[in-house]
Amino acid sequence: MRVDLEMTKRLKLLLVVAGYIYSQGTSGIDSLSIISEGWCHDLPRTIYANLERVNVSNKWFEVYRLDNDVFAIYEPQQWQEVISYLILGKEKALLFDTGNGIGKISEVVNELTILPVVVLNSHTHFDHIGGNSEFRDILAMDTGYTRNNVDGYSNELVREEISEEALCGSLPAEINPATYYTPSFIVKTFIRDGYKIDLGGRILEVLSTPGHTPDAISLLDLDLGLLCIGDIYYEGPIWLFVPETDLDVFYNSVKRLCNMVPHLTTLHPAHNSPIAQPQSLYALKKALINVQNGTISGKVISGGRLEYIFQ
């Protein structure tokens, strides 16, 4: 979910997919097995120097004002470098993902807007739903996978995410590694592909883009050409090895989004960097074809996973 490779003038894409010897019985998301040593030293990412930072009182987060009334809420002190997005309309705001739940994201949101806030997750992995329990108006995809994950994640499954290796800095005082967990949350409305959210003068459309997980979505602002893309694409290893992943389904989702590229101006990924070029989806599609056709060999890494690097 993160990487040491930076975007330069040429796209660098690394995929991590399940090898034939990967055990489908593996429990949890074995994150730390692929953390690069010294990842903290690669920070800050250069893109942030060119963005307007907004001061907030909760220092776990960094907030950046993007174009078109969008705020990127970034967690740089944890190795996932997760990014949630607050999107403002005239009458409502939408929070796309709620992060790891290490810092209280609701405190940040309340400083950025007085509008009522609806929450929608790009998918229900733990690093995207950590702050859901802080909100009452939650939309979620109507899938069995989603319904299973509303119960949250136990300390056993997520405690490595706040281990020394996973952090670049100190935890908030209220976080105890022995008791840290992802809380359960209540969904107000279950939704499906094509659902539209009216924020007042701004319409967002939910696009079902499964593959990384069965409930993965992208969020489209067609009028402005913006696409919040979750974990489908970002600057880093794109995880396609956990049991809930389906490579063929993921490819179909990427192909769907590639058809939209002519109408897009900006991608907002969920990790590492808040801005990516829509044309990056073409490179991702090509990489997936090469993996599926066996025209490139992967390198076996921890857990029997295969790593593919594309430039």
Regions flagged by a language model, labelled:
Residues 1-8:
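N-terminal secretory signal peptides that target proteins for export/translocation
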Residues 9-16:
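Sec-dependent signal peptide recognition
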Residues 14, 24-55, 252-311:
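Accessory terminal helices/loops
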Residues 48-60, 65-66, 93, 100-101, 141-207, 213, ...:
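Metallo-beta-lactamase
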Residues 57-111, 219-234:
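Conserved beta-strand hairpin/beta-sheet module of binuclear metal-dependent hydrolase folds
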Residues 67, 74-76, 123, 142, ...:
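Residues at the C-termini of beta-strands that transition into short coil/loop
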Residues 102-196, 235, 280-297:
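Active-site HxH/HxHxD metal-binding segment of metal-dependent hydrolases
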